[in-house]
Amino acid sequence: MAVTFTDLHTADGLKALEQHLSGKTYVSGNAISKDDIKVFAAVPSKPGAEFPNAARWYDTVAAALASRFPGKAVGVNLPGGGAASSAAAAAPAAKDADEDDDDLDLFGDETEEDKKAADERAASKASSKKKESGKSSVLLDVKPWDDETDMKKLEEAVRSVQMEGLTWGASKLVPVGYGIKKLQIMLTIVDDLVSVDSLIEEHLTEEPINEFVQSCDIVAFNKI
């Protein structure tokens, strides 16, 4: 039976997570899974000392993410000074999460069938000698200047950036405190055509979009 967590940015929400993780290493099962990634994305920062189980779990998932995605972070802000390498705020709505499950598949339990299928695909590509450009799924946090920023116009400005190889996906406004919300948005890129660093530095944080956008953080970057 599926477990539901709500308001993980609040003490009550973290209390429910703390109770669920009592005696457990992961949210479900004996290995890290999509369930852990979805819940991790909904926790704004590392839980405090009053939530030892949740804090331990948070560090475990953060370490797994860091090893999966090595390299220098791009403008990542860590509220609360936690030890984790990066933390998403609230996850997209459940419906969007289900619809975009493939995009958010940062981890998955790889079976023998999966490995065999992957080997067969690789062999097929090699034999046909077709060169296909890879794709990546990216999760961005887009932060406004203040609580007076029109978030609808901010999202419109972000989505106005169009280029070959870039596809915008699901999005959600996430509370970050003091009445301020940030935009959390998915995008898919063709690796040979789009650089996320250039997208942020040359488009999303430049005029005229920087009228609404203060900064952008890469929350997750996953090869498809």
UniProtKB/Swiss-Prot annotation:
Pfam families named among the record's database cross-references: EF1_GNE
Official protein name in the record: Elongation factor 1-beta
Family of the protein in this entry: Belongs to the EF-1-beta/EF-1-delta family.
Species assigned in the record: Oryza sativa subsp. japonica (Rice)
This protein's UniProt keywords: Elongation factor, Protein biosynthesis
One Gene Ontology molecular-function label: guanyl-nucleotide exchange factor activity
Cellular component, GO annotation: cytosol; eukaryotic translation elongation factor 1 complex
PANTHER family, per the entry: EF-HAND AND COILED-COIL DOMAIN-CONTAINING FAMILY MEMBER, ELONGATION FACTOR 1-BETA 1
Record note on quaternary structure: EF-1 is composed of 4 subunits: alpha, beta (1B-alpha=beta'), delta (1B-beta), and gamma (1B-gamma).
Entries under InterPro entries matching the protein: eEF-1beta-like_sf (IPR036219), EF1B_bsu/dsu (IPR049720), EF1B_bsu/dsu_GNE (IPR014038), Glutathione-S-Trfase_C_sf (IPR036282), Transl_elong_EF1B/ribsomal_bS6 (IPR014717), Transl_elong_EF1B_B/D_CS (IPR001326)
Keyword Transcription regulation: no
